[in-house]
Amino acid sequence: MEMVGKIACFVVLCMVVVAPHAEALSCGQVQSGLAPCLPYLQGRGPLGSCCGGVKGLLGAAKSLSDRKTACTCLKSAANAIKGIDMGKAAGLPGACGVNIPYKISPSTDCSKVQ
């Protein structure tokens, strides 16, 4: 019986050691998730399906590293994409009924994201 316990312990240990780690959030995921928001942020369309992307991003950014990545990607997009209404960008989480731990803005300090 003692041998069975050792084998079971070894099997569990192997499962923990080789368990797949969740993929880290990428800028590509952030951008594709929020692509439906672009017309709204540029004043060319309604909020529409944008909130699904915002909520999906919030759900995907579970770790501190993911939240900082999302912040950095959003900050870069806010700087790179022309015609974004920064007021709408900053108000996007509230308009979608979610709370994110930083402001969507080119001036956000993503190193302070918690």
UniProtKB/Swiss-Prot annotation:
Gene3D superfamilies: Plant lipid-transfer and hydrophobic proteins. Disulfide bonds join C27-C73, C37-C50, C51-C96, C71-C110. InterPro entries: Bifun_inhib/LTP/seed_sf, Bifunc_inhib/LTP/seed_store, Plant_nsLTP. SMART domains: AAI. Residues 1-23 form the signal peptide. GO terms for biological process: lipid transport. The keyword Disulfide bond applies. Keywords: Disulfide bond, Lipid-binding, Signal, Transport. GO terms for molecular function: lipid binding. It holds the Pfam family Tryp_alpha_amyl. The keyword Transport applies. PANTHER family: NON-SPECIFIC LIPID-TRANSFER PROTEIN 2-RELATED. Plant non-specific lipid-transfer proteins transfer phospholipids as well as galactolipids across membranes. May play a role in wax or cutin deposition in the cell walls of expanding epidermal cells and certain secretory tissues. Belongs to the plant LTP family. This is Non-specific lipid-transfer protein 2. It comes from Nicotiana tabacum.
